[in-house]
């Protein structure tokens, strides 16, 4: 179900990792049903779409002129705003006035838009953002994509789309998220990195422009219980308390993440494997 709403609050939050800031939500919810999705904890069903797009863009414009950010930094040359923190914008684009949003960032002297996606939306190729929209294609081993991200674009389709979006004027990054630790995880990521490397050569990507962000899994107790109730597959690798520790989210939720004593080693293993196979894919940040 998709409902139209009028956004009444326009809080812009600092990010500092993927982007400099998180924009007020153009949409809230997701029409996918990924097993690990934090959005499903807050909105289990449907999508709410803000109708007052120009009010949100006006707020971003007012904010960016006074944003205290030293540039350039690891987020980029421009002041970057995540426009899709609470949805998959590429999947939901047809419900938004997306061209108006993209034109705002394309034409703005300071601001740049960014979003992560698991959906290849070829309609977006009709627009040339002139490097002012960054698409972060989410990637994980295809074996687990099928189970944990049902009905999303395949990993192969996401990789094959990268040169098309680069040529159309988008900036494209890779979003390794969530990284899930289990018995064969490094073997599976080696295969994924090999495929990425072959694709980059076959499709002649501009390798130096395709950077990466890496986010290890955080899971949630309520989502875990809902997954069990709904009999979703894959929960056995998401919920592993023997290697995880509790964490209270900023909103008071009961989360679990990999134990800090182990996570440093996981990060080291991932980074060494990644850099051995695709060293051209600069990791912007990893946590």
Task: Describe the function of each predicted region.
Residues 3-22, 35-138, 164:
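Conserved Radical SAM active-site core
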Residues 24-34:
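Cysteine-centered iron-sulfur cluster-binding motifs in ferredoxin-type domains/subunits
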Residues 56, 98, 158, 189, ...:
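Aromatic/hydrophobic pocket-lining residues that form the small-molecule binding cavity
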Residues 78-82, 112-114, 132-136, 171-175, ...:
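Structural preference for beta-strand elements that scaffold enzyme active sites
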Residues 87-91, 120-123, 133-152, 178-183, ...:
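Conserved radical SAM core fold
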Residues 152-165:
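Glycine-rich S-adenosyl-L-methionine
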Residues 184-200:
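Catalytic cores of alpha/beta
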Residues 197-287:
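Auxiliary Fe-S-binding modules of radical SAM enzymes
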């Amino acid at each position: 179900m998709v409902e139209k709403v009028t956004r009444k609050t326009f809080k812009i939050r600092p990010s500092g990792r993927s982007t400099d800031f998180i924009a007020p939500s153009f949409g809230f919810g997701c029409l996918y049903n990924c097993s690990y999705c934090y959005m499903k904890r807050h909105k289990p069903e449907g999508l709410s779409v803000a109708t007052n797009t120009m009010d949100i863009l006006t707020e971003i414009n007012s904010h960016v002129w006074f944003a205290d950010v030293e540039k350039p930094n690891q987020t980029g040359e421009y002041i970057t705003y995540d426009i899709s923190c609470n949805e998959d914008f590429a999947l939901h684009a047809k419900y938004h006035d997306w061209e108006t949003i993209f034109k705002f960032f394309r034409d703005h002297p300071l601001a740049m838009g960014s979003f992560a996606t698991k959906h290849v939306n070829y309609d977006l190729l009709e627009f040339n953002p002139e490097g002012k929209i960054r698409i972060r294609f989410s990637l994980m081993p295809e074996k687990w994509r099928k189970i944990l991200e049902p009905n999303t674009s395949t990993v192969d389709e996401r990789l094959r789309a990268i040169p098309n979006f680069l040529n159309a004027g988008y900036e494209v990054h890779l979003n390794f998220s969530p990284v899930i630790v289990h018995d064969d995880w490094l073997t599976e990521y080696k295969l994924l990195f090999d495929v990425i490397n072959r694709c980059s050569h076959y499709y002649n990507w501009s390798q130096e422009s395709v950077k990466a962000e890496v986010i290890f899994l955080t899971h949630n107790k309520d989502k875990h219980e809902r997954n069990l109730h709904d009999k979703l597959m894959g929960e056995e690798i998401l919920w592993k308390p023997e290697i995880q520790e509790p964490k209270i989210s900023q909103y008071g939720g009961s989360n679990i993440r990999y134990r800090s004593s182990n996570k440093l080693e996981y990060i080291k293993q991932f980074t060494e494997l990644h850099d051995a196979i695709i060293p051209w894919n600069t990791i912007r940040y990893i946590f």
